[in-house]
């Protein structure tokens, strides 16, 4: 995968095998996976970490193979999904940390550039999520109000 804001190449990664049904060695059922996902979400675990916990602790290679639904879909069906997608939330938290750092270290030009690139990614993601109707049309990112959006 190519990198976005550099001339260098990105890291290559392995691709997952194409499967349509769960492997026979996986003995856990769809109802069990759903309850585990909901319990982990109530404990404050993010969706990416839920997938890793399912893989490492419970031997579930892919939640979608067993339940037929993604982790976020399971959360939406049980009305506990977050309003803002997780990748956008993580970028906003990163931008808030950079802004806090730059308020103390005003001459740090490298992190000024990093903040600029991060906020560009945020705007690009917001545009995509508006097109996909995940975010409402009137939603927009403002650095001044971003901290209130995240803590809600």
Curated annotation (Swiss-Prot):
GO terms for biological process: translation. One of its GO terms (molecular function) is structural constituent of ribosome. Residues 1-11 have a biased composition (Basic residues). Residues 1-23 are annotated as: Disordered. Signal peptide: none annotated. Keywords: Ribonucleoprotein, Ribosomal protein. SMART domains: Ribosomal_S13_N, Ribosomal_S15. InterPro entries: Ribosomal_uS15, Ribosomal_uS15_arc_euk, Ribosomal_uS15_N, uS15_NS1_RNA-bd_sf. GO terms for cellular component: cytosolic small ribosomal subunit. HAMAP family: Ribosomal_uS15_A (MF_01343_A). Part of the 30S ribosomal subunit. Belongs to the universal ribosomal protein uS15 family. This is Small ribosomal subunit protein uS15. It comes from Methanosarcina acetivorans (strain ATCC 35395 / DSM 2834 / JCM 12185 / C2A). The gene is rps15.
């Amino acid at each position: 995968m190519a990198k976005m804001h550099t001339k260098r190449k990105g890291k290559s990664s392995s691709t997952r095998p194409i499967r349509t049904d769960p492997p026979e060695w996986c003995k856990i059922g769809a109802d069990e996976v759903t309850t585990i996902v909901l319990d982990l979400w109530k404990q404050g675990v993010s969706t990416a970490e839920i997938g890793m916990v399912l893989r490492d602790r419970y031997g579930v290679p892919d939640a979608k193979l067993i339940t037929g639904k993604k982790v976020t879909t399971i959360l939406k069906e049980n009305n506990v999904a977050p309003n803002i997608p997780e990748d956008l939330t993580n970028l906003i938290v990163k931008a808030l940390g950079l802004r806090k750092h730059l308020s103390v270290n005003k001459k740090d030009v490298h992190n000024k550039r990093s903040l600029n690139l991060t906020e560009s990614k945020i705007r690009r993601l917001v545009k995509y999520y508006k097109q996909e109707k995940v975010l409402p049309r009137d939603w927009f990112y403002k650095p001044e109000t971003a901290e209130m959006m995240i803590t809600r």
